Amino acid sequence: MKNIKRIAVWSGPRNLSTALMRSFGSRNDFDILDEPFYASYLKKTGIQHPMFDEIIKSQSSDYKEVSEYCKNGYFKKSYQYQKHMTHHMINNDYLDFALSLKNVFLVREPVLVLRSYKKKNKNYDFQDLGFRQQFDIYKYLKDRFGLIPIV
């Protein structure tokens, strides 16, 4: 199996993560994995996001299966960019896959995140912004594995 170098970028919504992902995607040596835990999150929470049915049908909704794919899934190119939304991780049960990846935390000024999020979502909960989950995932990787992710 090809030795693929994998980058996991952990973000919350409205952090310009899609723009960064597209930038990496424009390179000819990168494959992209966009929000692989989205279906798992939707199925576990029952939240009716736009295109709920299509997402559930197009992705695995099993956290264990998705984490294994993030760690060992085959891709054609030498590098893989994984865009992860921190609020899609319900708990830290399936984060061990991140040990084998280079982890990066994308953080944007919270006031700008909130301002941008409020424009698109009138009803929201603080948990929807992913700040707490991002901190928890960072701390988990640091405390459990001794990793010092890039911020």
PLM segments and residue spans:
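PAPS-dependent sulfotransferase catalytic core
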Residues: 1-75
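Residue-level preference for short coil/turn positions at secondary-structure junctions
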Residues: 3, 75-77, 99-100, 109
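Short catalytic-loop micro-motif centered on adjacent basic/acidic residues
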Residues: 8, 80-82, 149-151
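Short His-Asn-centered micro-motif
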Residues: 10-12, 34, 82-85, 107-108
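A generic structural signal for alpha->beta connector loops
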Residues: 27-30, 78, 100, 146-148
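Residue-identity detector for glutamine
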Residues: 48, 59, 80-82, 127, ...
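Glycine-rich phosphate-binding loop used to anchor ATP phosphates in small-molecule kinases
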Residues: 68-93
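PAPS-dependent sulfotransferase catalytic domain
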Residues: 85-151
